Amino acid sequence: MNVIHKIGVILFLLCPYISLYGQEGKDTLMFRIVSYNVENLFDSRHDTLKNDYEFLPDATRHWNYSKYRKKLDNIARVIIATGGWTPPALVALCEVENDSVMRDLTRYSALREADYRYVMTQSPDKRGIDVALLYQRNLFKLLSYQSLPVDKPRKNSRPTRDILHVNGLLLNRDTHDVLVAHFPSRSGGARESEPYRLLAARKVKHAIDSLYTIRRHPQIVLLGDFNDYPENKSVKEVLEAAAPSTLQDSLRPQKLYHLLAGKA
């Protein structure tokens, strides 16, 4: 699903992010958010109880510290480039192995000058890949975060990645909720694997609906790799995500918009 998950952009948003469409009012806060599937960010050491053997020095990929360092540097350069003159305020990452690779990325790559902090999931995924969120503390004050486990369609089904829910404050003191998701892949066929993605989408939808009940004016962004297109059931029917209009007056509160819909 390379067409989808190599694109580093915001995939979903809810009003009132009108400022992203070009008009700024006195209370508007402009900041950049990036979603990026880094594709197998593994270090070269074995992570106990995880199936990461493909990314060890003696495996078929001959993965080693030098290759790992180069990948970190490449990821850092991409993130910096997306920010223009300033690094993005928030960066959602998919397919990161563990805390170790996140520490290396934030402290020992070109990102170290950006002073990012991060939170991530610790999912039961057998390969050990997770999702994470980088944030700049001067732009986003972390209040809380949690992992949301995704149900399995059958008891013997393979576990998948948790969904990351992060809550924080922007500079204008608005509460901001970020959900980072990496839906199950299409391995084995799109139709055969679809039930897994539908369950993940329902988990996200439940989390969003819950935020509607506790926030008067929820400001929610959903980021990640959904392994589906805008017209697929997980996006169109479960999440009910629509293509955004270029006219800000037509955007509705408590409505989910897919920023890539109609752009393929």
Question: Language-model segments: which ranges?
Answer:
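Loop/turn elements at helix/coil->beta-strand transitions in domains of secreted/extracellular proteins
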Residues: 29-32, 86-90, 113-116, 172-176, ...
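Active-site metal-binding loops of divalent metal-dependent hydrolases
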Residues: 38, 96, 183, 225-226
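Structured beta-strand-rich core segments of catalytic domains in phosphoester-bond hydrolases
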Residues: 96-176, 181-184
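Sec-exported extracytoplasmic/periplasmic mature domains
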Residues: 80-87, 98-111, 139, 206-216, ...
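N-terminal, active-site-proximal structural segment of metallo-dependent hydrolase catalytic domains
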Residues: 20-115, 119-131, 201
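Metal-dependent phosphoesterases centered on the DNase I-like endonuclease/exonuclease/phosphatase
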Residues: 197-264
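Active-site His/acidic residue clusters
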Residues: 49-52, 178-196
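Bacterial Sec-dependent N-terminal signal peptides
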Residues: 1-28
